[in-house]
């Protein structure tokens, strides 16, 4: 009976910690443009999905492509998108919809440098809905980074700026 009480106390403490971390995550992690992009590509059907870096974000316009080709598209390019990020975004898209084409804009600079840890490290992963791609992305990329990045994804954001936004998060 004594061991049972210890187990129950441990479960309660873990549940409280998980709830607290989830609440802090919801309150302090800023809403990013990536959230909108990931939501768009998993919720809507597009003929073409464009992945890549900041060059693709500024230089490839899906609306112009649609005018010329008649095919719908969405641009998920963003600065700091490494090959591994694009791969798992493509995997997520393939799980959720079946685009006719995935266009990948390549910046060779991202293949000769290591992905830096920091608040940009979770930019993509944090916005993925629960899926097989998210679990694989975690084990192949995110699990190798600093544990604070996984448990406290908001730790690198300026709290002075974000605290003023907390009220807006819940209204």
What are these regions (language model features)?
Residues 119-171:
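Secreted/periplasmic serine-hydrolase-like ester/acetyl group-modifying domain
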Residues 5-27:
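Hydrophobic membrane-insertion alpha-helices, especially the h-region
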Residues 98-100:
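Proline-aspartate-enriched helix->loop->beta-strand connector
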Residues 28-81, 87, 92-95:
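Serine-esterase "nucleophile elbow" of acetyl-processing enzymes
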Residues 58, 83-86, 110-119:
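Extracytoplasmic/secreted cell-surface and envelope-processing proteins
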Residues 21-29, 45-55, 160-171:
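Phosphate-binding glycine-rich loops and adjacent basic patches that engage nucleotide phosphates
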Residues 104-105:
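Short beta-strand segments
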Residues 1-3:
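N-terminal hydrophobic targeting signals that begin at the initiator methionine
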